[in-house]
Design a protein with these regions (language model features):
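Alpha-helical transmembrane segments and their immediate juxtamembrane cytosolic regions
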Residues: 1-371
Length: 371
């Protein structure tokens, strides 16, 4: 069996780590409550974290554009979400760690709040669309696909940025954004841009170019933030409005600089060619990490328990704590996901379960085939 190359799998792991960094900071309110040097370093961490969701979207397009739609994969994801929602809420309800009324508990396990997992929501929709997107990608010519990507980026990234969010303002938390970056990943895969792009340069030179693009775009976003803050302090309603819009826009997934960072980082990792079974295995678990730590009851309580406060701790201590808590959350969620997989494997060994699963998948799969 061919082992998948580990360059993008390593990127998945790194990206999930920084997504957790983002959540630790934002769910704790640190970006709002911090001041001075602490605020500076927290914002640097946020700006190092914001583009990693877009990286995930590109990776999805890169691989899924050459893969077949598998209903079992979708059903497995939905089952995983339901499992964690039931187990986590039941654990906190029984132990009393989190206060529930009986009605609250029943609501939490029977009516799942998909909006809490907006990325998973978008992923499911894009996965359902993938047979149709892939048919289009396979049949369209290169120029047309490139033009489509440009139009999508203009509509959902560049125009909103230039107009301070007055046009097509989706913030990037949408299926539109996911489909756009799906096409970007598919384009890179279909036309082998990792080899073709900058082909006059050797590997080391390519890496330097991609890294330079990444650093310049990241620094540009940092400068944008401080320029926007400067505008908010001027005696002009118009400039204040633009400044306030840009302060927020730096953290939008549709920010052109964020998209450039994600693409350049993806291309940089495309220059690394190696395989590692351990990295691939851990990478296969990271979606579970996202689901666990973003489940409503975890998200609404965990960051209060962490008790991160800029009022009682110095900037250095708070940054160290952010990284430390991120590592703990990542490792604990990985271990939980390993246990969950073992449980599911044991359940699937039951003959009746396999039979029901096979019949259900075959029935629905036949309904959804794209001929």
């Amino acid at each position: 069996m061919k082992i998948r190359e580990s360059n993008y799998e390593l990127l998945r792991i790194i990206s999930m780590f920084f997504i957790i960094v983002w959540h630790v900071i934002t769910h704790s309110g640190l970006e709002v409550n911090s001041i001075g040097a602490t605020n500076f370093f927290i914002n640097l961490l946020l700006l190092l974290s914001i583009f990693h969701v877009s990286v995930f979207m590109i990776i999805t397009g890169y691989y899924q554009s050459k893969s077949k739609f598998k209903l079992r994969r979708l059903l497995s994801l939905l089952l995983e979400i339901g499992f964690y929602n039931f187990v986590i809420n039941t654990f906190f309800y029984i132990t009393g760690i989190v206060e529930y009324t009986n009605i609250d508990y029943l609501k939490s396990i029977l009516f799942y709040n998909f909006s809490a997992l907006w990325y998973i929501q978008c992923y499911i929709i894009v996965y359902l669309l993938s047979p149709f997107l892939n048919r289009f990608i396979a049949n369209v010519d290169r120029v047309t696909l490139k033009k489509l990507i440009i139009v999508l980026l203009l509509c959902f990234s560049i125009f909103p940025f230039l107009s301070s969010g007055l046009t097509f303002n989706t913030n990037g938390f949408t299926v539109y954004q996911y489909v756009t970056l799906y096409f970007v990943g598919a384009y890179i895969r279909k036309y082998n841009l990792n080899s073709e792009f900058l082909n006059r340069f050797n590997k080391s030179q390519k890496q330097l170019i991609y890294l330079s693009i990444f650093i310049v775009s990241w620094l540009s976003n940092v400068m944008l933030y401080y320029f926007a803050n400067y505008l908010t302090q001027l005696d002009s309603n118009i400039l204040n409005y633009i400044g306030n819009s840009l302060v927020v826009y730096k953290y939008y997934y549709s920010n052109p600089l964020v998209i450039i960072q994600s693409i350049s980082l993806f291309m940089l990792f495309g220059t690394f060619k190696f395989t590692n079974r351990f990295i691939n295995y851990i990478a296969s678990l990271v979606l579970g990490v996202y689901i666990i730590h973003e489940t409503d009851v975890i998200k609404n309580n965990l960051y209060n328990w962490l008790n991160l406060s800029v009022d009682i701790e110095s900037g250095k201590i708070i940054i160290i704590k952010i990284i430390l808590f991120t590592i703990i959350i990542f490792v604990v969620c990985i271990l939980i996901e390993i246990v969950r997989r073992l449980i599911f494997k044991l359940i699937y060994k039951i003959k009746t379960v396999r039979s029901i699963d096979g019949k259900l998948v075959n029935f629905i799969d036949n309904l959804m085939k794209v001929n």
